[in-house]
From Swiss-Prot:
GO terms for molecular function: fatty acid binding. This is Fatty acid-binding protein, brain. GO terms for cellular component: cytosol; nucleus. InterPro entries: Calycin, Fatty_acid-bd, ILBP, Lipocln_cytosolic_FA-bd_dom. Keywords: Acetylation, Cytoplasm, Lipid-binding, Transport. Monomer. A fatty acid binds at R127, H128, Y129. It comes from Bos taurus (Bovine). The gene is FABP7.
Length: 132
């Protein structure tokens, strides 16, 4: 099922992302860059691992993991998290935990586009990606 996500994706639309970053505690300058950056996300399967590469003019990140297994992740805004990515039906669910806090991203494919819903507490952001 991960195969449905394996592609190169370009951000096309973003809703409430500034409020989401603010809730996470991301500083003003980093939020300004985050709001205008249009990252490319490359999702691939390499052997039994899933790899998610995020490339932008701001910062490049890469995570490699086994589905359902916890791993250490350093985010683009330099949070050190314990993360787990798993499949829930046709959704790819990514949970990050740090300092007693938790956020999650749910990626799903709708009409050939990848929709990513980011939730932290009661703040929800939605980012839309199209195949590059």
């Amino acid at each position: 099922m991960v195969e449905a996500f394996c592609a190169t994706w370009k951000l096309t639309e973003s809703q409430n992302f500034d409020e989401y970053m603010k809730a996470l505690g991301v500083g003003f300058a980093t939020r300004q860059v985050g709001n205008v950056t249009k990252p490319t996300v490359i999702i691939s399967q390499e052997g039994d691992r899933v790899v998610i590469r995020t490339q932008s003019t701001f910062k490049n990140t890469e995570i490699s993991f086994h589905l359902g297994e916890e791993f250490d992740e350093t985010t683009a805004d330099d949070r050190n998290c314990k993360s787990v990515v798993s499949l829930d039906g046709d959704k790819l669910v990514h949970v990050q935990k740090w300092d007693g806090k938790e956020t999650n991203f749910v990626r799903e494919i709708k009409d050939g586009k990848m929709i990513m819903t980011l939730t932290f507490g009661d703040v929800v952001a939605v980012r839309h990606y199209e195949k590059a």
